[in-house]
């Protein structure tokens, strides 16, 4: 059975903003998001993104005390899903997901995987586009990304 790939909103927003949303599809194929994530994204979804919601609404509400609705719903769905990977960037959300035993990656992990899978030749042009947005990318993090991507 193929691993389920779940995503929070930030990866979709930032990659769409720089014209690279298709990278997620090329790296992972189909992904799953929740209604809350779809509402935060606010744009028409490509056919390779499907919507599924967590069954346990109370658990989602408890998570909302720590993180926003999109992150809470994505984490709650990940808890209910067996063998999944959650794409999430928010530090608080990442820490919470890891505490719950959820495998995670982030936008930069998607970009690195695209490079390591020979989907893209270099992460540098994508990082340059991201730096032109309001997405935070420190010099230290950029160096780590380049190193992991073998650049």
Descriptions of predicted regions:
Residues 2-84, 91-94, 100-102, 125, ...:
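Active-site-proximal, substrate-binding regions of enzyme catalytic domains
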Residues 35-37, 43, 94-151:
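Acidic, PIN/NYN-like endoribonuclease modules and their adjacent C-terminal/linker elements
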Residues 26-28, 89, 107, 119:
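A generic membrane alpha-helix/interface feature
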Residues 1-3, 150-151:
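Short, Lys/Arg-enriched, disordered terminal segments
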């Amino acid at each position: 059975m193929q691993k389920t790939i779940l995503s929070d909103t930030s990866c979709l927003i930032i990659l769409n903003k720089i014209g690279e949303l298709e990278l997620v599809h090329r790296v992972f194929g189909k992904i799953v998001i929740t209604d809350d994530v779809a509402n935060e994204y606010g744009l028409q979804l490509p056919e390779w993104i499907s919507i599924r919601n967590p069954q346990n609404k109370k658990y989602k509400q408890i998570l909302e005390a720590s993180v926003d609705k999109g992150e809470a719903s994505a984490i709650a769905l990940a808890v209910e899903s067996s063998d999944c990977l959650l794409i999430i960037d928010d530090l608080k959300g990442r820490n919470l997901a890891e505490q719950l035993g959820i495998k995670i990656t982030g936008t930069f992990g998607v970009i690195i995987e695209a490079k390591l899978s020979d989907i893209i030749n270099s992460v540098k042009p994508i990082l340059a586009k991201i730096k032109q947005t309001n997405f935070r990318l420190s010099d230290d993090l950029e160096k780590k990304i380049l190193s992991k991507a073998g650049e």
